[in-house]
C-alpha cells in the first residue's frame, strides 16, 4: 500500500518543498538577545535546567565569567570513571554490572550485593516467550536502532503494570531493560542479516553466569566464540558509555518525557530515538566513514599527505563534503575526553593482536594533525580534543562488531544511565518540563475560501 502512494506523494511534496522551506525559515535577528538556541548559553555552555547526583562531566571551570580549560573528568555517582575502569583492569574483572548497580542504586555494592544483582541480571536477560518470533522476526528492520525502539515499546504489552511509576516498579523495569537490550540487539541484527542480506539465521540465547559483554559477543557470533581479552575490552566500552550527565541529548529527552508522568518504555524509546541521530550516538559510524576516506587517499607515513587531505575535507572538497572532521571537539571537554584517553590506552594491544596497528596509528595522526587545522580555521587557540567517537568505532571493528550495531551497542550501555536519570527525575522533579518559544509570526486575518489566491507553489 505504501508503494502504491509513494509516487503520488513524492510529486505532491516535491512541488511544495521550496514554499515550505520559505515559510519555516526564521530570520537570524530573532535569535539575538535572550534566546537560548539549542539550550546553549552565549559562551557555548549548556543552560542549567536541573541538578543531579547520577553523573557529571567536567571539561572546564569558570573564572571571572570565563571558561578555563581543564583536563576532562567523568564521574559516576561522584566516583571518577577512570578510577573505576583502572580498578577493574587491575583486578582483571568485568565492571559493567557494577557500574549499572552504582548508577541505579547510588552506591558501590558489596560482594554479596553485586552477586545478588548479577543473579537477577542473569534471569532478566531472557526475553519474554515468543518475543523474538512475534516482534523481531515478523517485522524485520534494516536499522537496528529502529528495531530496538519498536521492541521497547512492544515490551509495554508484556508488562502487567506498565504505567505504574512507583519507584520499585520503575527499578524492576529498569533492570529488565538493561538485561533485555543485548538480546534484542543481537537478535535484531541476526534477523536483519537473514532477511535483507541473505545470510543464514543464527539466534543464540543468553547464558547465565556470563557478563553482559561475554553474552553479547556470544550472541553476535555464529560460532559463539570469543576471547577473554575481547570481552574485557567490550566491557570497558560499556563502562565508558554508561552515563554522561543529565544534559546530553538522549538523557535529557528521557528526563523530559519522564517529567510528563509517562511510562518507562515510552521514556526509554524516546531516548533511543535521540541516540540514533548522527549528531549524537551515530557519530561513531561517521568517524569510521571519514577514516575510510582518509585511508584510501593518503600516505599514512607522510604527515603532509594527511594534512592536505584533511584540509580538503574541511574545504568540503573530499570525504562526505560536510566540512567536518568527525570525532574532534566536544561541547564540554576541552583538553581531553577521559573516555577517549581510556580507549587509546587499552585498545592499542588489541589493535596489534588483530592486525589494526596501522589503522590505530593513522587515526592518532588524524587527531594530532586535524585539531591544529580546525583551530587555524577558527582563528582560535582554544584547546580541542578527540572525543570518544574518534576511537570507539575502530574498537568495535577490531571486535568484529558491524557498523549497524555501533550505536545500538552504545544504547546497551547508556540504558543504565537513562534508567538512573529517569528514576531521579520521577523522585525529585514534580513539574513537567515546559520551556518557552517566542512567536515571531506576522499576525493576519482568516480569509474566506473564495477570496484566497492560488499558492505560488502550485
Residue ranges and their predicted role:
Residues 1-458:
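Non-transmembrane, aqueous-exposed alpha-helical and coiled segments at domain scale
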Amino acid at each position: 500500500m505504501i508503494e502504491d502512494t509513494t509516487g503520488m506523494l513524492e510529486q505532491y511534496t516535491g512541488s511544495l518543498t521550496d514554499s515550505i522551506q520559505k515559510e519555516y525559515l526564521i530570520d537570524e535577528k530573532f535569535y539575538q538577545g535572550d534566546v537560548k538556541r539549542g539550550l546553549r548559553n552565549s559562551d557555548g555552555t549548556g543552560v542549567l535546567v536541573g541538578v543531579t547526583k547520577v553523573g557529571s562531566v567536567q571539561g572546564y571551570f569558570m573564572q571571572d565569567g570565563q571558561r578555563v580549560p581543564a583536563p576532562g573528568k567523568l564521574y559516576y555517582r561522584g566516583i571518577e570513571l577512570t578510577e573505576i575502569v583502572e580498578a577493574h583492569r587491575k583486578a582483571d574483572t568485568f565492571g559493567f554490572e557494577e557500574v549499572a548497580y552504582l548508577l541505579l542504586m547510588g552506591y558501590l555494592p558489596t560482594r554479596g550485593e553485586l552477586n545478588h544483582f548479577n543473579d537477577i541480571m542473569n534471569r532478566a536477560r531472557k526475553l519474554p516467550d515468543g518475543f523474538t518470533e512475534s516482534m523481531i522476526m515478523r517485522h524485520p528492520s534494516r536499522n537496528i536502532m529502529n528495531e530496538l525502539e519498536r521492541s521497547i515499546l512492544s515490551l509495554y504489552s508484556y508488562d502487567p503494570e506498565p504505567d505504574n511509576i512507583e519507584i520499585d516498579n520503575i527499578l524492576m523495569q529498569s533492570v529488565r531493560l538493561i538485561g533485555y537490550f543485548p538480546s534484542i540487539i543481537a537478535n535484531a541484527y541476526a534477523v536483519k542479516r537473514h532477511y535483507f542480506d541473505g545470510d543464514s539465521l543464527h539466534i543464540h540465547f543468553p547464558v547465565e553466569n556470563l557478563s553482559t559483554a561475554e553474552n553479547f559477543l556470544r550472541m553476535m557470533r555464529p560460532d559463539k566464540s570469543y576471547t577473554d581479552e575481547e570481552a574485557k575490552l567490550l566491557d570497558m566500552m560499556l563502562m565508558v558509555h554508561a552515563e554522561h550527565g543529565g544534559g546530553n541529548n538522549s538523557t535529557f529527552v528521557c528526563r523530559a518525557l519522564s517529567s510528563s508522568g509517562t511510562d518507562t518504555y515510552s521514556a526509554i524509546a524516546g531516548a533511543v530515538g535521540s541516540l540514533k541521530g548522527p549528531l549524537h550516538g551515530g557519530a561513531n559510524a561517521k568517524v569510521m566513514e571519514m577514516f575510510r576516506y582518509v585511508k584510501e587517499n593518503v600516505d599514512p607515513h607522510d604527515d603532509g599527505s594527511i594534512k592536505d587531505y584533511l584540509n580538503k575535507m574541511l574545504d568540503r572538497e573530499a570525504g562526505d563534503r560536510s566540512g567536518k572532521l568527525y570525532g574532534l571537539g566536544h561541547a564540554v571537554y576541552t583538553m581531553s575526553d577521559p573516555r577517549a584517553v581510556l580507549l587509546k590506552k587499552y585498545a592499542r594491544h588489541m589493535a596489534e593482536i588483530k592486525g589494526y596497528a596501522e589503522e590505530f596509528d593513522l587515526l592518532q595522526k588524524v587527531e594530532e594533525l586535524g585539531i591544529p587545522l580546525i583551530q587555524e580555521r577558527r582563528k582560535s587557540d582554544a584547546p580541542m580534543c578527540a572525543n570518544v567517537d574518534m576511537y570507539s568505532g575502530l574498537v568495535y571493528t577490531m571486535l568484529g562488531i558491524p557498523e549497524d550495531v555501533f550505536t545500538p551497542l552504545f544504547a546497551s550501555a547508556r540504558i543504565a544511565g537513562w534508567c538512573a536519570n529517569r528514576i531521579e527525575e520521577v523522585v525529585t522533579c514534580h513539574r513537567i518540563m515546559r520551556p518557552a518559544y517566542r512567536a515571531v509570526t506576522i499576525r493576519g486575518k482568516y480569509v474566506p475560501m473564495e477570496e484566497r489566491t492560488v499558492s505560488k507553489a502550485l
